[in-house]
Design a protein with these regions (language model features):
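Class I S-adenosyl-L-methionine
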Residues: 102-134
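Short, well-ordered coil/turn elements that cap or connect secondary structure elements
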Residues: 15, 42, 87, 112-114
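Conserved beta-strand signature within the Rossmann-like core of class I S-adenosyl-L-methionine
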Residues: 89-96
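Short "lid" loop at the C-terminus of a central beta-strand within the Rossmann-like core
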Residues: 68-70, 97-102
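A short glycine-rich, Lys/Arg-flanked "PGG" loop and its adjoining helix->strand segment in the class I
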Residues: 76-88
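Glycine/threonine-rich flexible loop motifs
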Residues: 72-74
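Conserved SAM/SAH cofactor-binding pocket of Class I
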Residues: 1-64
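Short, glycine/charged-enriched secondary-structure capping and boundary segments
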Residues: 13, 35-37, 76-79, 107-110
């Protein structure tokens, strides 16, 4: 989830015209993100649960540190829900620990979702996977 909002807030500060959706299942985390966005004057940040995003919304960019430890079935369901919602030409960046299956996740995205997926960056045991719309 978005936690207190570091990724969402950084993206909103860097992209002054973008609408940023920060998702979490934890209401405390969502409240912290909302408060931090308000303190920074970021009215374009929406902190909500996944149910708060209308089905017709498409994303140009997704940044995520997906919850790998929830298990493959839950993780795969999550990715099946959100990655296909990338707009044409959209891209997703997924931060995954190498020792928690970044390579197998990359192969799964390519084979199961049919989406091009490659390593965007790698450092200190983490990989950033880049997923593009086909």
């Amino acid at each position: 989830g978005c936690g207190w909002g570091p990724i969402a807030l950084t993206l909103a500060l860097a992209s002054r015209h973008a609408t940023v959706h920060a998702l979490d299942v934890n209401e405390r985390a969502l409240d912290l993100t909302r408060r931090n966005a308000a303190a920074l004057g970021l009215e374009r940040v929406t902190a909500t649960t996944a149910d708060g995003i209308p089905d017709d919304v498409r994303f140009d960019l997704i940044w995520s540190n997906p919850p790998i430890r929830v298990g493959k079935a839950v993780l795969h369901d999550l990715l099946r829900t959100w990655l296909p919602r990338l707009a044409p030409g959209g891209v997703a960046y997924l931060v995954v620990q190498k020792n928690l299956g970044s390579d197998s996740l990359q192969r799964w995205i390519e084979s199961e979702l049919g989406m091009p997926c490659g390593r965007f960056a790698s450092s200190k045991g983490f990989r950033v996977l880049e997923v593009r719309t086909p």
